[in-house]
Amino acid sequence: MGIRAQQKEKTRRSLVEAAFSQLSAERSFASLSLREVAREAGIAPTSFYRHFRDVDELGLTMVDESGLMLRQLMRQARQRIAKGGSVIRTSVSTFMEFIGNNPNAFRLLLRERSGTSAAFRAAVAREIQHFIAELADYLELENHMPRAFTEAQAEAMVTIVFSAGAEALDVGVEQRRQLEERLVLQLRMISKGAYYWYRREQEKTAIIPGNVKDE
């Protein structure tokens, strides 16, 4: 990459970080202006268009980055699990660390998931689906269950995790610890329930052939 390309990428990165820094519990992406973001990044407003077509393209890039960042962290968590440790507890701790270190990235995903922009809703839905698919892959590999079961389990887990994450955004350390414990319990219940249901379906299938009558 040449010097010019490096500088362009650096400025683009500054714009993304500037936009993230201006989000808060009180301020959504929709309230940001191009001028504010450009000023925070240290560039002229007109220079913004060298990097993004408009503010919406910047926002969609932020959604993609937020989802990717979370998925990469969860992959790292699964690598830690491979060396020993509780799957669910390690995953929950990693997720809560992500929220603590990147609250605005998670806020963006939460808000735009049900926001007014169809493009943003689709982008967030796509990121969540990636998250579900990766978790389903892992569950299928580890638990040796059919894809239909692991997808249903992964979707239930991600739904509960995102709900807990929304609660965790604006609470204190002790409340977050309690949330973590509750989330670990809920995910274990889903995991046990999925395994029980799978075994039940297997037993039903095994019984059926012996019960078939000659007609």
UniProtKB/Swiss-Prot annotation:
Record-linked InterPro entries: DesT_TetR_C, Homeodomain-like_sf, HTH_TetR, HTH_transcr_repressor_FabR, Tscrpt_reg_HTH_FabR
GO molecular function: DNA binding; DNA-binding transcription factor activity
Keyword Membrane: no
GO-annotated biological processes: fatty acid biosynthetic process; negative regulation of fatty acid biosynthetic process
Record keyword Magnesium present: no
Oligomer status and interactors: Homodimer.
The protein, known as: HTH-type transcriptional repressor FabR
Organism the protein comes from: Shigella boydii serotype 18 (strain CDC 3083-94 / BS512)
